[in-house]
UniProtKB/Swiss-Prot annotation:
Pfam families: OMPdecase (PF00215). Keywords: Decarboxylase, Lyase, Pyrimidine biosynthesis. GO terms for biological process: 'de novo' pyrimidine nucleobase biosynthetic process; 'de novo' UMP biosynthetic process. Homodimer. The keyword Lyase applies. SMART domains: OMPdecase (SM00934). Substrate binds at residues 12, 34, 62-71, 117, 180, 189, 209-210. Catalyzes the decarboxylation of orotidine 5'-monophosphate (OMP) to uridine 5'-monophosphate (UMP). It catalyses: orotidine 5'-phosphate + H(+) = UMP + CO2. Coiled coil: none annotated. SUPFAM superfamilies: Ribulose-phoshate binding barrel (SSF51366). It comes from Ruegeria pomeroyi (strain ATCC 700808 / DSM 15171 / DSS-3). This is Orotidine 5'-phosphate decarboxylase. GO terms for cellular component: cytosol.
Length: 240
C-alpha cells in the first residue's frame, strides 16, 4: 500500500512512547506525521528522528517559532539537523526570512502561520489584533509571508481557495489544520472543512489529529479520511 502523503496525522499524544505506538497501529496507511509543542518535552525530537530514520516517515515539526531574527535563525539551524520536512514559524516577514536563513542548504520547508484555525474575530479582538475580516487578514499575512520567502502557509481551509489564487502563491504549499470528516465533532476548531472540500479548494496537505488519534480504530479512521480525499468531490483545480 502506498500512503497518500497529503494526509498528515497530528501525533497529539503525551509522549514519544505513545506516539510510536500510534504510528505502529497506523502502519502503512499514514506516511506523514506532525509533532507539536505538546510532545516536545516528551521526547518529540527523538520520535521524529526514529520515525524518519527507522520507518521512512515524513515529519512536520509544528513549533510556531516567534522571536528576534537571530534567535529564530539559530533555532532553525539547530532543528534542521533532525532531517525534518516541514517546520512552522509565525508569519511575520522578519521571522520567515530568518527561518529561511537558518534552513539554508537543507531540504526543509518553512511554513508560515497566518491565523490559528481555533480563532475567530472575537478572539482577535480580545488579543487586540487589528480590525478587519479574518479572511482578509489571512490573505494579507499569507501574501507577506510568501514575499518574505515562505515555502508555504498554514491557514484554515476556509481561506485556502483565495490563498491559492494569490499571484504570490504560485509553487507554494498550503497546509490546513481544522479538518474534520463529515459529521465529526469540531472540538476547539472554529474555521473548518471536510477533507474533500479542502482538497477541492487547492490544499496540498491536510492535518488531522483527534478524529484519528481518538478513534477506536485509528487505522480505519485514517483510511476513511483518505477515501474522502480521493472522492469525486475532492478534485483539485487545475493550477496551470
Amino acid at each position: 500500500m502506498l500512503a497518500d502523503d497529503r494526509l498528515i496525522v497530528a501525533l497529539d499524544v503525551p509522549n514519544a512512547v505513545a506516539g510510536l505506538a500510534l504510528a505502529e497501529r497506523l502502519g502503512d496507511a499514514v506516511s506523514f506525521y506532525k509533532i507539536g509543542l505538546g510532545m516536545l518535552t516528551g521526547g518529540g525530537l527523538a520520535l521524529a528522528n526514529e520515525l524518519k530514520q527507522e520507518h521512512g516517515k515524513r515529519i512536520f515539526l509544528d513549533m510556531k517559532l516567534f522571536d528576534i531574527g537571530n534567535t529564530v535563525e539559530a533555532a532553525v539551524r539547530g532543528l534542521s539537523q533532525f532531517d525534518l520536512d516541514f517546520l512552522t514559524v509565525h508569519g511575520d516577514p522578519h521571522v520567515v526570512r530568518a527561518a529561511k536563513e537558518g534552513a539554508a542548504g537543507k531540504d526543509l520547508k518553512i511554513l508560515a502561520v497566518t491565523i490559528l484555525t481555533s480563532l475567530n474575530r472575537d478572539d482577535l479582538d480580545a488579543s487586540l489584533i487589528k480590525p478587519g475580516d479574518v479572511h482578509d487578514l489571512v490573505l494579507e499575512r499569507a501574501a507577506r509571508a510568501f514575499e518574505a520567502g515562505a515555502d508555504g502557509v498554514i491557514a484554515s481551509p476556509q481561506e485556502a481557495a483565495a490563498i491559492r489564487a494569490l499571484p504570490e502563491a504560485a509553487g507554494r504549499l498550503i497546509v490546513t489544520p481544522g479538518i474534520r470528516p463529515a459529521g465529526a465533532d469540531l472540538g476547539d476548531q472554529k474555521r473548518v472543512a471536510t477533507p474533500a472540500n479542502a482538497i477541492a479548494d487547492g490544499v496540498d496537505h491536510i492535518v488531522v489529529g483527534r478524529p484519528v488519534v481518538h478513534a477506536p480504530d485509528p487505522r480505519a479512521a485514517a483510511l476513511s479520511i483518505l477515501a474522502e480525499m480521493t472522492s469525486p468531490q475532492a478534485v483539485a483545480p487545475n493550477r496551470s
